[in-house]
């Protein structure tokens, strides 16, 4: 059994960042039937999902607690690939801070080809 862990105190002004990120994440959501835009927004509001925003990109993550370890899951991303790649060290530090031992991510074949050299 796995569960998402609420770790964010969500004190930053997420709504302003969400206005920018929403169209990028909406595009990514076209490839899943597990979530819709309202689900993602609610997850951010409740601190279950974490919103990462760059100048041209956005990413949504969540921390999942499995029986034997914690992992950070890269749920959705959109925008500039190089900028998203540059976010990974910060996400790794964040994950380590919360005791995560793994980083997971999935996606379309195009993303998977790009992420494979990074160890995904």
What are these regions (language model features)?
Residues 1-35:
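Short amphipathic alpha-helix that is part of the acyltransferase structural core
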Residues 12, 49, 117-120:
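Short glycine-aromatic motifs
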Residues 29-49:
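Active-site rim helix/loop that mediates acceptor-substrate recognition in acyltransferases
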Residues 40-42, 63-64, 93:
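Short, flexible, glycine/charge-rich loop motifs used to bind or transfer phosphoryl groups or to couple energy/partner
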Residues 45-82:
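Conserved donor-binding loop and adjoining core beta-sheet/short helix segment
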Residues 69-118:
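Acyl-donor binding region in acyl/amide transferases
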């Amino acid at each position: 059994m796995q569960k998402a862990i609420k770790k964010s105190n969500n004190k930053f002004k997420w709504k302003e960042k969400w206005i920018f990120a929403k169209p990028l994440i909406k595009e990514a959501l076209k490839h899943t039937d597990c979530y819709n835009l309202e689900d993602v927004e609610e997850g951010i509001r409740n601190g279950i999902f974490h919103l990462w925003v760059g100048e041209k990109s956005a990413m949504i993550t969540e921390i999942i607690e499995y029986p034997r370890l914690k992992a950070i899951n890269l749920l959705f991303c959109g925008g500039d690939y190089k900028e998203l790649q540059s976010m990974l060290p910060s996400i790794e530090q964040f994950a380590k801070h919360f005791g995560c031992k793994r980083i997971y991510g999935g996606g379309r074949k195009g993303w998977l080809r790009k992420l494979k050299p990074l160890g995904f």
